[in-house]
Amino acid sequence: MSKCESNIDELIVPELAGIAGTVSSRLSDFRDWRGDASADVSELETAASDLEVCGLTVTAIDFANPCARYSEVSFELGGYVVHGRLIEPSGCARRSELVPLCLMFHDIDRPVRGWHHMTRFAAMGYAVLALDDETIGSSDLQQGITSPAFVERVPWGCALAKVARNLDGMDPDRIFAWGEGLGGGVALAVSALDERGLACTALANPLPSGLETLSPRVRGSVLMGTSLMDTVSDPKGQFAVFNGLECDRRHIIYAKYAHERINAFENEVVDFFNQTFYSCSLA
């Protein structure tokens, strides 16, 4: 039986659950919400299964860091040229010949994270391969998971997973994903549709709507963060995504955050990855 953990009971005050508009009332309403898991994902399935990657190039960048190697990755997929940023540990940061690799996906209205930010993964002994695609906004996702912009990005993410497994020095059995907002939605979809499944997935305030249709397909463990003040990714819809998962899962709910980066959750993500791959934590 899969393991399910959440801090929801810590946030609900029984005496306030019947008062409309309170955190306790909202969470009582959200607790068992499963949404509408009937979205048509046939186009996503087709796109994610047709992964003929061509012309893969890995171009080294010299940042003179003795503990990390940096490269720009590109390949062709279905008429598109997909770009990514690759960082892998080296020197004293490399714990083994084959290392785990994090697939990283960014949110709407934001570009790929910088090299400096992502170097943290190398310091922990992980490689990271981040999708470097054009920035889109919420208006591009109005059709939920059937939105062309989302359907376009999911096979890019699945192709990155395929590429990652074949890179020298990467452990094909320890590929995992992390994303916020749109990136969280892409990470979840890749975990659900990737032919081998991912070792684990972390996501915060995932979007677009309709992701609960993919939840039952996710393999590997999941850590999910939800901000109750989020007006971009509906918190109630996020509960549907979490409640649809059938794998080991943990849900951390934040009452006082909106659609934003949560440093405390990033710490939880690091802890989650370390416990998954190295049996250690920050605690």
Task: Enumerate the predicted regions with their spans.
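N-terminal targeting or regulatory segments adjacent to alpha/beta-hydrolase or S9 domains
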Residues: M1-R69, M124, L282-A283
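C-terminal catalytic histidine-bearing segment of alpha/beta-hydrolase fold enzymes
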Residues: K3-E10, A240-A283
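N-terminal cap/lid segment of alpha/beta-hydrolase-fold proteins
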Residues: E52-E97
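Short beta-to-alpha linker loops that shape the active-site pocket of alpha/beta-hydrolase fold enzymes
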Residues: S90, D132-G137, L207, Y257
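Active-site glycine-rich loops that stabilize anionic/oxyanionic intermediates
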Residues: V99, M104-R110
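Cap/lid segment of the alpha/beta-hydrolase catalytic domain
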Residues: R113-P155
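Primarily recognizes the serine-hydrolase "nucleophile elbow" in alpha/beta-hydrolase
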Residues: C158-E212
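The feature captures the conserved acid-bearing segment of alpha/beta-hydrolase catalytic domains
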Residues: L207-I253, H259
